[in-house]
Amino acid sequence: MKTLFADLAGDLDGEPDHGTPLVLLHGLTFDRTMWRPALAALAELDPGRQVLTLDLPGHGGSPAWPSYDLESLAQAVYRGVGEAGLQPPVLAGHSIAAVIATIYAARYPASGVVNVDQPLQVEPFVRLVKSLAGPLRGPGFAQVWEQFEASMGIGLLPPAAQELLQSSRYVRQDLVTGYWREAIDRPADELATMTADGLAAVRDAKVPYLVVAGHDAGPEYLSWLNQMLPQASVTVWPGSGHFPHLAQPRRFAGVLADTAGWPETSR
């Protein structure tokens, strides 16, 4: 069923009595179609599972906003989940949407988070985008974005997955800098404190948390993550770049299927 869920374009499929519902959130500059290969496999592995896929504001069929902050984006997803009539869901978010999913789990009832290739330690990324603020907001945007895109490992994906991403790209300067505004403009220590507070809320609520990464983040990051979010587990799929859900869609569908019994979180 295709419709709008609190002004977010989306698809709602499955039945409410087939395990914990799923909410899938795409990464920046893409749209909800990126989940199609995994959803096709999920229909075989976990038939009838209730799944809501949403286009984030400014992507796909969802209208643009004058500005984007992550708290408001999480709130928009929460409104969409409510309008869809879902029980507390497991949220799977790719890239920046994993941050949105994590904020959701810190603020609203959630049954779990599947983080697709998004580090949660904000300082390295914040330092990087602050150093590139001028080109990002000026005529050098296209060149800078090419560098970011080159680091994603799209060429590691099967040809069909590469074509899917190319067909769903929404690379606009105002969109990228809008979603990155807080990282560019707000002090790094302030963002680090916000992250720590959010992770503390997820930790205290004992929300199940799984990271599916395309590369090993290293022992220092894993030690930090274990301290901040002890219940988080990390699985690395080497050679899948920034898109492990597209590199191995059936394996990722298995990950989603395994969340069917994740417990609800009372709040």
Predicted regions and their residues:
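Active-site loop/oxyanion-hole signature of alpha/beta-hydrolase fold enzymes
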Residues: 2-11, 50-92, 96, 254-257
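Conserved HGGG/HGGXW glycine-rich cap/lid loop of the alpha/beta-hydrolase fold
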Residues: 4-63
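The conserved beta1-alpha1 loop
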Residues: 25-27, 94, 213
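Conserved catalytic-core motifs of eukaryotic protein kinase domains, centered on the activation segment
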Residues: 34-36, 62-68, 125-127, 222-223
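Flexible "cap/lid" loop of the alpha/beta hydrolase fold
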Residues: 102-106, 110-145
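Conserved alpha/beta-hydrolase catalytic His-Asp/Glu region
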Residues: 124-126, 142-202
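Conserved serine/cysteine hydrolase catalytic core
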Residues: 176-236, 245
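Catalytic histidine-centered segment of alpha/beta-hydrolase-like enzymes
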Residues: 237-253
